[in-house]
């Protein structure tokens, strides 16, 4: 049925039950309004602040830290390569302040960080088992890991596994162990 039903009493007038398009009269040059136009415009939504879940923000922060960690590891690797070009014992004795094996342990750890991005306590314990016969090598390994833990920015340590954050907190203990080592070797 059409909108303008014609009644029998007056074919020129619309039925009162028919709905007119709008409350206003239609004027020449005006567009005919459809029923959709006639209804109220949809309620405008208030602009809402963009809500980012805490988990998403945390992931983005971790990604940013991972990028910075990769950069720090590259810098450490470059620094280690400048310390490593020793082929003769005379060159090694020049850099005895840090110790050749300490630097070699640091190079190994930095390579592992670059490749797997993790230094775990299980890896450290395996390395300690290998160096267990030599007290000096064990101390050098611990010193190397402690130095590495202090070279990497603290807010990125959590991304490196569980070894370096635990060593970072034990800084005073490490200094005490180094002093004891020096006093026993003298």
Curated annotation (Swiss-Prot):
Skewed-composition ranges (Polar residues): 1-12
Pfam families xrefs: Paramyxo_NS_C (PF02725)
Q: Where in the cell is it found?
A: Host nucleus; Host cytoplasmic vesicle
* Entry's Gene Ontology cellular component terms: host cell cytoplasmic vesicle; host cell nucleus
Q: Which UniProt keywords apply?
A: Host cytoplasmic vesicle, Host nucleus
Question: Major place of localization?
Answer: host cell
The ranges of region (Disordered) come to 1-43
Q: How does it assemble?
A: Interacts with the phosphoprotein (via C-terminus); this interaction allows C to associate with the ribonucleocapsid.
What's its job? Ribonucleocapsid-associated protein that interacts with the phosphoprotein (P), thereby increasing replication accuracy and processivity of the polymerase complex.
In the record, the note on similarity to other proteins reads: Belongs to the morbillivirus protein C family.
* This protein's name: Protein C
Q: Which organism is it from?
A: Measles virus (strain IP-3-Ca)
